[in-house]
């Protein structure tokens, strides 16, 4: 079974951040042949209170083929992510977004360092409209990333041909971009009750 390690700033049961959360949930629901490990925050977008009833800083069974690590702000570090990647030893690292230090840039650097197969979902962040918000800061960051060849080892996931064009326009036509549309919602996903049964809760 293919093991996929996903990094995303916010995930279910949080919904405040919108589309990316649902897109990732749909991806997980549509691929029961894979085992997913989602590394995320233990709070929702723009929220300060932790999710009720969910134990943070450990792997929690979310569905039959998905576990989630709800990380607290105090425990969030590059070393923590590297340790979890080493412990899980996934076949694929799937990064959501471009700019987040903890959930995009750190995983990208770690994946490159250890030679891990890495997929980056830009989530529309390289569209002309998105680049128009704080453009100078983004221009400097993306220029720096191109200079470092930071995405040379990456496969980009675009959800349309338009997004593929946006990615290659910003980062270079040589970028490996695969187009896979967002998947339709299959079923509601919600965290299952935490179980101490062997194999259902991993303490790393």
Tell me what each language-model feature is.
Residues 1-52, 60:
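N-terminal subdomain of nucleotide-sugar transferases
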Residues 1-3, 187-203:
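Nucleotide-sugar donor-binding and catalytic loop/hinge architecture
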Residues 3-4, 92, 108-128, 155-157:
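Active-site proximal beta-strand in glycosyltransferases
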Residues 12-13, 101-102, 116-136, 152:
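A short, histidine- and acid-enriched strand-loop-helix "catalytic/donor-clamping" loop
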Residues 37-92:
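A conserved catalytic-core segment of Leloir-type glycosyltransferases
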Residues 82-103, 114-119:
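Short N-terminal targeting/anchoring amphipathic segment
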Residues 138-156:
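Membrane-proximal helix-turn-helix segments that form the acceptor-binding/catalytic region
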Residues 162, 183:
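Carbohydrate-associated surface elements
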């Amino acid at each position: 079974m293919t093991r996929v390690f996903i990094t995303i700033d916010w995930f279910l049961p949080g919904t405040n951040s919108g589309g990316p959360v649902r897109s990732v949930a749909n991806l997980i629901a549509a691929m029961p042949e894979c085992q997913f490990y989602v590394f995320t925050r233990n709070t929702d977008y723009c929220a300060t209170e932790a999710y009720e009833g969910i134990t943070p800083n450990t792997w929690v069974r979310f569905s039959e083929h998905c576990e989630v690590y709800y990380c607290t702000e105090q425990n969030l570090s590059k070393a923590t992510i590297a340790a979890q990647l080493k412990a899980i030893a996934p076949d694929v690292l799937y990064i959501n977004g471009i700019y987040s230090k903890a959930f995009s840039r750190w995983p990208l650097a770690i994946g490159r360092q250890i030679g891990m197969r890495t997929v980056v979902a830009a989530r529309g962040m390289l569209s002309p409209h998105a680049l128009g918000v704080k453009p100078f800061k983004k221009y400097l960051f993306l220029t720096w990333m191109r200079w470092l060849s930071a995405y040379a080892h990456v496969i980009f996931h675009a959800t349309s041909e338009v997004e593929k064009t946006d990615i290659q326009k910003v980062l270079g036509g040589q970028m490996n971009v695969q187009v896979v549309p967002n998947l339709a919602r299959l079923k509601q996903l919600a965290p299952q009750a935490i179980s101490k049964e062997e194999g259902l809760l991993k303490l790393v």
